[in-house]
C-alpha cells in the first residue's frame, strides 16, 4: 500500500530541491530521515517534513508498519514563479525570480 504527502508552493527552486530528493529515493524511511536531518540544505528540511507527513499518513490511514516503509517515489515539480523588480542605477531595473516548487513524497511497504 502507498501513502502520499505533498507540499505545494514550497519556497525553494525545484532544481535545488531535486538534489536532495535524488538522495533519498528508494531508501528505507529511517535511513532517509537520518540523511535529511544532517543535510545542510534548506530543501532538506522541507522534504523531511513532507516525508514525516507521508509516514504519518501511512500509519494512520493505511495502518502500515513504519519499520517496513520505504521511500518509493519522490518528485519535485516547478511551482509558480513570483516576479519582482530590483531598481538599478540610471533608471534601469532588473527582474528577480522567486521560484517555488511542489514536493511530493510517496512511501510504500514492500
Curated annotation (Swiss-Prot):
Entry function: This protein binds specifically to 23S rRNA; its binding is stimulated by other ribosomal proteins, e.g. L4, L17, and L20. It is important during the early stages of 50S assembly. It makes multiple contacts with different domains of the 23S rRNA in the assembled 50S subunit and ribosome.
Transmembrane annotation, as ranges: none
UniProt keyword Coiled coil, yes or no: no
Gene (UniProt): rplV
Pfam families: Ribosomal_L22
Coiled coil: none
Family: Belongs to the universal ribosomal protein uL22 family.
Any GO molecular function: rRNA binding
Any one of the GO CC terms: cytosolic large ribosomal subunit
InterPro entries given in the database record: Ribosomal_uL22 (IPR001063), Ribosomal_uL22_bac/chlpt-type (IPR005727), Ribosomal_uL22_bac/org-type (IPR047867), Ribosomal_uL22_CS (IPR018260), Ribosomal_uL22_sf (IPR036394)
Quaternary structure, from the entry: Part of the 50S ribosomal subunit.
Alphabetic keyword roster: Ribonucleoprotein, Ribosomal protein, RNA-binding, rRNA-binding
Single GO BP term: translation
Name of the protein: Large ribosomal subunit protein uL22
Amino acid at each position: 500500500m502507498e501513502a502520499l504527502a505533498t507540499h505545494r508552493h514550497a519556497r525553494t527552486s525545484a532544481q535545488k530541491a531535486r538534489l536532495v530528493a535524488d538522495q533519498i529515493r528508494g531508501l528505507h524511511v529511517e535511513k532517509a530521515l537520518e540523511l535529511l536531518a544532517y543535510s545542510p540544505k534548506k530543501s532538506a528540511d522541507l522534504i523531511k517534513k513532507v516525508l514525516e507527513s507521508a509516514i504519518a499518513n501511512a500509519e494512520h490511514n493505511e495502518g502500515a508498519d513504519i519499520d517496513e516503509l520505504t521511500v518509493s517515489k519522490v518528485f519535485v515539480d516547478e511551482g509558480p514563479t513570483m516576479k519582482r523588480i530590483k531598481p538599478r542605477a540610471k533608471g534601469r531595473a532588473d527582474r528577480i525570480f522567486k521560484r517555488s516548487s511542489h514536493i511530493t513524497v510517496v512511501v510504500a511497504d514492500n
